[in-house]
């Protein structure tokens, strides 16, 4: 009888293990290119950015899905940094080589080079088969691509991305930028739910620059997003690291990760606290069809 009991326990344990699925997502902050960086990367034949990622490439590549905020355009020459960013194509090649899987393009610099910058960036990303979300050539393009659904390791992750503004520049017809608009976001969340995702993650370009604490508007919007059905929130824009929190859901056992700002990842900013940022790992576990946050952690860079 004891042997039979042990066999049953082993079988139950084995079945439970086989029913478990896990995925690790890695989020980083702003991928930027200022004039000094562009100059430093210049070689006789072009640009070389391998040094930017050589110490963290392994960690990025180990994640099942690595996501970063592309806060430049790839608008072609002349290459420039602040205030109107256009980075060399080699910067994107290095980002892909470092192991990034998805890039966010909804930020206040996505229209720095106007229609050409938005469309050339999208074309180059597509040519490298690099999924991105937040900016679109046309409304039809947005309808086909958004929300971005990522499928890996048996998981379906719906990724949303929005920006507070584009530095006063309006998108040229027929280009589309995802702005923070609760009416539109609510509609997008409903579309995301129809995709039957295991998790909905909202990436928000929000808040006030250089402030180490989140603004009340960020907190209010985070509360609203969770109430609407978003599972986790990743923030950018302030260029400094802001607090992170794990919030227990009020209605069921789920927990929600809220990162108000990851700060800078690659940049040449020199203001206080802008010379680095955070990488956040989010591990999800699915058991018997139910997805929960297994763990989360961060490292400063």
Give the positions of each predicted feature.
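Acidic, metal/ion-coordinating pockets
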Residues: 19-301
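Bacterial Sec-dependent N-terminal signal peptides
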Residues: 1-20
């Amino acid at each position: 009888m004891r042997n039979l009991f042990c066999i049953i326990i082993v079988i139950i344990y084995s079945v439970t293990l086989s029913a478990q699925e896990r995925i690790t997502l890695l989020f980083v902050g702003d991928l930027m290119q200022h004039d000094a960086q562009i100059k430093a990367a210049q070689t006789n034949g072009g640009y070389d950015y391998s040094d930017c990622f050589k110490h963290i490439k392994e960690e990025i590549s180990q994640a099942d899905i690595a996501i970063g905020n592309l806060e430049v355009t790839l608008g072609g020459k002349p290459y420039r940094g602040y205030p109107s960013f256009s980075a060399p194509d080699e910067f994107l090649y290095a980002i892909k080589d470092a192991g990034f899987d998805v890039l966010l393009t909804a930020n206040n610099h996505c229209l720095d080079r106007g229609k050409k910058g938005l469309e050339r960036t999208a074309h180059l990303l597509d040519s490298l088969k690099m999924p991105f979300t937040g900016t679109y050539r046309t409304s039809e393009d947005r309808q086909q691509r958004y929300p971005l659904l990522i499928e890996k390791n048996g998981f379906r992750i719906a990724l949303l991305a929005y920006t507070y503004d584009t530095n006063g520049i309006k998108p040229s017809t027929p280009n589309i930028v995802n702005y923070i608009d609760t009416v539109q976001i609510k509609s997008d969340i409903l579309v995301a739910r129809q995709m039957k995702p295991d998790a909905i993650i909202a990436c928000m370009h929000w808040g006030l620059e250089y402030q180490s604490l989140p603004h009340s508007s960020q907190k209010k919007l985070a509360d609203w997003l969770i109430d609407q059905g978003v599972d986790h929130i990743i923030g950018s824009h302030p260029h400094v690291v802001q607090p992170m929190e794990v919030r227990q859901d009020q209605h069921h056992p789920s927990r929600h990760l809220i990162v108000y700002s990851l700060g800078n990842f690659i940049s040449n900013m020199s203001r206080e606290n802008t010379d680095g940022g955070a990488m956040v790992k989010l591990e999800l576990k699915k058991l018997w069809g139910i997805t929960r946050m297994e763990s989360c952690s961060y490292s400063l860079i």
